[in-house]
Amino acid sequence: MLPPAIHLSLIPLLCILMKNCLAFKNDATEILYSHVVKPVSAHPSSNSTLNQARNGGRHFSSTGLDRNSRVQVGCRELRSTKYISDGQCTSISPLKELVCAGECLPLPVLPNWIGGGYGTKYWSRRSSQEWRCVNDKTRTQRIQLQCQDGSTRTYKITVVTACKCKRYTRQHNESSHNFESVSPAKPAQHHRERKRASKSSKHSLS
C-alpha cells in the first residue's frame, strides 16, 4: 500500500495523462476526417464527371471532339487508258487520263497512300455521305489521229490531272424542294379565277 501523500501526488499526473490521451484521440479523428473530406471538395461530383465515365472518359468540349473525329480525306483516283476515235480516224497512241470516283475516304484507307496528298481536307464519319469526289485540275493535250486514207488529224482534248473532295448539302441531292415550292401557288390562281367568275356572273344578272 502506498502512503496517502504519494496518492495525492499521482492525481495531477493522472489528470495530465488523461488530457494528453483525449488530445491524441481528437487529433486522430480530425486527421482521419480531413483525409476523407479533401478529395470530395477538390473534385466535386457532377453530371459531367458521370457522363465522362459513361462515354469512356471523353470531354464534352467541341474542340476535343472535332480533333478526334476529323481526319484528312482524299479522293479515290482511277487511271484509265483509252483510244480516241472520230469516224474512220483513231488515235495513234493511247490516252491516259485520271478518273475521279464518286466517294471520298480517309487518306490511310486510300491505295498508294504514302502520308500526303494534294487537296486534302478534313472528313467526319457522320458527314461521309455529303462529300463527293469531283474534277479539280485539267489540262489541254493534243493527240494525233490516224485515218484509214493515210491522213492524220490533230485534236485538242481536256484531260483531268487532279481530283478534290467537294461537300454537297442535302438541297443539292433533293430536287423535290423545287416542285414543292411551286405547287402551293396553283390553288391561289384557281381561287382568283373563281372570284372573277363570280363577279362576272353578278354583273350579268344585274
Swiss-Prot record:
Keyword terms of this UniProt record = Disulfide bond, Glycoprotein, Secreted, Signal, Wnt signaling pathway
- Chain segments carrying region Disordered: 42-62, 176-206
Keyword Lyase listed? The answer is: no
Q: Provide the free-text tissue specificity comment from this protein's UniProt record.
A: Highly expressed within the maximally sensitized/receptive endometrium. Weakly expressed in brain, kidney and the female reproductive tract. Expressed in the dermal papilla (DP) and at high level in the precortex of both anagen vibrissae and pelage follicles. Dynymic expression during the hair cycle.
Q: Which interval of the chain is the signal sequence?
A: 1-23
Comp. bias (Polar residues): 43-62
Residues carrying a glycan: N47, N173
Per its record, what triggers expression of this gene product? Up-regulated at day 5 pregnant or pseudopregnant of the uterine glandular epithelial cells, at time of maximal sensitization for the decidual cell reaction. Down-regulated at day 6 refractory uterus.
* S-S pairs: C75-C133, C89-C147, C100-C163, C104-C165
Q: Where in the cell is it found?
A: Secreted
Question: Could you give one GO CC term from the UniProt record?
Answer: extracellular space
What is one Gene Ontology biological process annotated in the Swiss-Prot or TrEMBL record?
Answer: cell fate commitment
- Regions of biased composition (Basic residues) lie at 188-206
> Which residue ranges does the record assign to the CTCK domain?
75-170
Q: Which GO terms describe its molecular function?
A: BMP binding; BMP receptor activity
Oligomeric and partner information: Interacts with BMP2, BMP4, BMP6 and BMP7 with high affinity.
Q: Which family does it belong to?
A: Belongs to the sclerostin family.
Give the function comment from the record.
Answer: Directly antagonizes activity of BMP2, BMP4, BMP6 and BMP7 in a dose-dependent manner. May be involved in the onset of endometrial receptivity for implantation/sensitization for the decidual cell reaction. Enhances Wnt signaling and inhibits TGF-beta signaling.
| Protein name in the entry | Sclerostin domain-containing protein 1
